[in-house]
Amino acid sequence: HNMFLEGTLLKPNMVTAGQGCPKKYTPEDIARATVTALNRTVPAAVAGITFLSGGQSEEDATINLNAINQFPGRKPWPLTFSYGRALQASVLKAWGGKDEL
């Protein structure tokens, strides 16, 4: 398809268990599954990976991204985040819609 991979940023979710899954996986489990999936599918030429929070809390998304970055496996792309709601939720809750200055 004549894609310029070196100019491409990929915005995936992390590999996490579904909402109905009763087992709680560790950040290390999530890191292993995520890095494995990326290595199997994403060309090394891709310019970078910017993770979405995928419905995780701000704390879980941050802990899991740290585990992914610390994971010793091959990661030929820069890894960062593109969180929206995960970083806004606690701020919006604290604000609560009040019109104070």
From Swiss-Prot:
In which pathway is this protein known to take part?
A: Carbohydrate degradation; glycolysis; D-glyceraldehyde 3-phosphate and glycerone phosphate from D-glucose: step 4/4
Keywords (alphabetical) are: Glycolysis, Lyase, Schiff base
Q: Which GO terms describe its molecular function?
A: fructose-bisphosphate aldolase activity
Segments traversing the membrane: none
Give the top-level enzyme category: lyase
User: Known Gene3D superfamilies for this protein?
Assistant: Aldolase class I
Kindly give the InterPro entries that the UniProt entry links to this protein.
Aldolase_I_AS, Aldolase_TIM, FBA_I
Asked whether the keyword Lyase is assigned, the reply is yes
State its Enzyme Commission number(s).
Answer: 4.1.2.13
Q: Name one Pfam family in it.
A: Glycolytic
Q: What reaction does this enzyme carry out catalytically? A: beta-D-fructose 1,6-bisphosphate = D-glyceraldehyde 3-phosphate + dihydroxyacetone phosphate
Q: What does the entry give for GO biological process?
A: glycolytic process
Instruction: Check the UniProt entry and state the signal peptide residues, or none.
Output: none
Keyword Cytoplasm on entry: no
Q: Where is the active site?
A: K11 (schiff-base intermediate with dihydroxyacetone-p)
UniProt lists the family membership as follows: Belongs to the class I fructose-bisphosphate aldolase family.
Name the chain's protein. Fructose-bisphosphate aldolase
Whose protein is this, by species?
A: Lymnaea stagnalis
